[in-house]
Amino acid sequence: ASASTESKWNISIRQLVTGANPMDILAVQEAGVLPSTAIMTPRQVQPVGVGIPIHEYEWNLGSSSRPNSVYIYYSRVDVGANRVNMAIVSRMRADEVYVLPPPTVASRPIIGIRIGNDAFFSIHALSRGGNDGGAIVSAVDMHFRNMPHINWMIMGDFNRTPGSLIGLLDPDLRSRINVVSPPSFTQTSGNTIDYAITGNSSTTSLYDPPRILAILAVAGLRTFLASD
């Protein structure tokens, strides 16, 4: 996902959200710079007390007479190179926006949105092994500990396989999550490191994973959006 970012948005991502079987929610790592046609809205979506900026943009993929807008929630975490900025694209406007602080000193922040009782997060674990992957899942779980009505999904580049990620989690958390992997590998070396984790933070009821088809960005356009 390191091609020219403007073309990445205008070709790959546009195709994923407007083509056949368009995606409702798309998690974008290495989001680079947003397309010039994405307009920042005046809505204040910044969570109180978290100093990591996030903004809402409206991106019209149709025309002025026949608009077809999606919303982009964009956090410029990479102020220097602009390469590893984070984004979530949604066909529906978010009811709430989340920015969870980096779970370890070296980690990136965790950004997310809530639509109804469903929360979606875009994450990018540390390179060379994704050692903070377990901390990322635990941080999301802890955030919703007193909100058992919320189902959450963490999507992105975990930089480690699902099996090795599960090994980082405590047994209680393992019983409340489900891994949703794309049908083919997502890294040129043949590993699957881009996938989703669904879960619920209720510790009193049995977790029943949602029936999710290929919601992952990497499943639809692996050649464009797979990891290096």
Tell me what each language-model feature is.
Residues 1-16, 25, 80-228:
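Active-site regions of metal-assisted phosphoester/phosphodiester hydrolases
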Residues 30, 75-76, 156:
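Short glycine-centered, acidic/aromatic-flanked micro-motifs in structured strand/loop junctions
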Residues 1-68, 83:
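N-terminal, active-site-proximal structural segment of metallo-dependent hydrolase catalytic domains
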Residues 66-79:
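Conserved catalytic-core segment of clan PA serine endopeptidases
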